[in-house]
Structure formats: structure tokens, C-alpha cells
Amino acid sequence: MFNQSYLNVYFICGTSDVPSHRTIHEVLEAALKAGITLFQFREKGESALKGNDKLVLAKELQHLCHQYDVPFIVNDDVSLAKEINADGIHVGQDDAKVKEIAQYFTDKIIGLSISDLDEYAKSDLTHVDYIGVGPIYPTPSKHDAHIPVGPEMIATFKEMNPQLPIVAIGGINTNNVAPIVEAGANGISVISAISKSENIENTVNRFKDFFNN
């Protein structure tokens, strides 16, 4: 069952996103201890794990999340999400159609990336629990990212559909969250702001403060 508070501090990470002196297990556990509300396993890039290695890691990270009662979401990979019985899946505009995914994930969380009004107009949101809007700011984490849309895009979507849960993504750090919250976002999703933080507990707590009112 989806709760929009899951979106408050949404951590996204894969093996290529963590510094060389840490493992993804260490980074995730530190983030979980600090109080992230949702985790998405996003294994991308040239060095990304594949096949059984990816499956094994996904199971380990899923187990870690469940120890802290945090839902585990898989990015894009429908077969992996089904195989490990993930708590949900997040897809982009170029990935499998949401309607097709929904038949496999009737009781799971489904998220969809939307960057602009055109994508919003052509997206079927019938089975979608939340949308990820961005990039809000310039981001180094996604080389294929769109042009930054700014917090204004969140405000526009909220005006069009006030009940639609929205999580912001792209270039977000603890210094630029306020305009996102003011625009009406239900949460923020970050990669490097947490994965490369020198003090994960402090970073997560600062993010949480914006949504604890």
C-alpha cells in the first residue's frame, strides 16, 4: 500500500554512485539508519552489474531495506522486480508501458518519470502512485537527463492535479530544497547528495526537516 510520505526522503543508488572507499551496502545502511523513507535500486552505467550478480545484490539490499521497514523499489527492470517480489517499480517514458506493468504489480508501488507538459499529457496515470518530476536542477548523476525544469514545473503539475503525489529529482541538495517544498512537492529524490555525503546522517536529517512540519 502506497503512502505519499514514502516520498519525503527518497534515496536512489547503484554501485556506480558510491565512492570507491565505501560499499553500496555501507552507504545504504547509513541512509536507512538516518531515516530515508524510500529506496530505489538503480543499477546503470558501464560498470553496472548484470545477471546473477545484479540479482544477488538486489536481494541483499532489499533485505537491508526491510530490516528498517523501508520499501524497496527497482528502477526499470520489470523482470528483476518480479523475481525478487520488490515493493514497487519506477519507470521512465522510454521504458515498458505503465498499463502493462500494472498487471504484474497490482499491489505494488508504481512510479513514473515525467519531465514536461508534453510527457504529462501523453502519460496514462491511472495506475501510477506517484510521478518523479525533473531534473529540477542541473545534475551530474544522469548523463541522459533533460534540460532542468525548475521547481515551477512541480507547481504547474500540482495546480493541474492537486491529488497527484510528486517527488522532485535532479541536482537536489540540502541548500536548494526550500523552493521545491514551497512548490508543493511531497518529497525529494537524490542520488549523490546522500551517496557521496561525508556525513550521511546529517544530510538525511537536514532533508527530513523540510517535511517534518
Swiss-Prot record:
Q: Look up the record and name the pathway of this protein.
A: Cofactor biosynthesis; thiamine diphosphate biosynthesis; thiamine phosphate from 4-amino-2-methyl-5-diphosphomethylpyrimidine and 4-methyl-5-(2-phosphoethyl)-thiazole: step 1/1
Q: Which keywords are on file for this protein?
A: Magnesium, Metal-binding, Thiamine biosynthesis, Transferase
List of residues binding 2-[(2R,5Z)-2-carboxy-4-methylthiazol-5(2H)-ylidene]ethyl phosphate: 139-141, 171, 191-192
This protein is called what?
Thiamine-phosphate synthase
Sorted alphabetically, the Gene Ontology BP terms of this entry are:
thiamine biosynthetic process; thiamine diphosphate biosynthetic process
The record's EC number reads 2.5.1.3
- Listed binding positions for Mg(2+) are 76, 95
Q: Which cofactors are reported in the record for this sequence?
A: Mg(2+)
The Swiss-Prot or TrEMBL record describes its family as follows: Belongs to the thiamine-phosphate synthase family.
Q: Which GO terms describe its molecular function?
A: magnesium ion binding; thiamine-phosphate diphosphorylase activity
Q: Which InterPro entries match?
A: Aldolase_TIM, ThiamineP_synth_sf, ThiamineP_synth_TenI, TMP_synthase
Could you confirm whether the keyword Lyase appears in this record?
Answer: no
Coiled-coil stretches, from where to where?
none
Q: Which reaction does it catalyse?
A: 2-[(2R,5Z)-2-carboxy-4-methylthiazol-5(2H)-ylidene]ethyl phosphate + 4-amino-2-methyl-5-(diphosphooxymethyl)pyrimidine + 2 H(+) = thiamine phosphate + CO2 + diphosphate; 2-(2-carboxy-4-methylthiazol-5-yl)ethyl phosphate + 4-amino-2-methyl-5-(diphosphooxymethyl)pyrimidine + 2 H(+) = thiamine phosphate + CO2 + diphosphate; 4-methyl-5-(2-phosphooxyethyl)-thiazole + 4-amino-2-methyl-5-(diphosphooxymethyl)pyrimidine + H(+) = thiamine phosphate + diphosphate
Q: Which HAMAP family match?
A: TMP_synthase
**Record's GO cellular component terms:** cytoplasm
> Which of this chain's residues are annotated to bind 4-amino-2-methyl-5-(diphosphooxymethyl)pyrimidine?
40-44, 75, 113, 142
Native organism:
Staphylococcus aureus (strain MSSA476)
What is written in the cofactor note of this entry?
Answer: Binds 1 Mg(2+) ion per subunit.
Function comment: Condenses 4-methyl-5-(beta-hydroxyethyl)thiazole monophosphate (THZ-P) and 2-methyl-4-amino-5-hydroxymethyl pyrimidine pyrophosphate (HMP-PP) to form thiamine monophosphate (TMP).
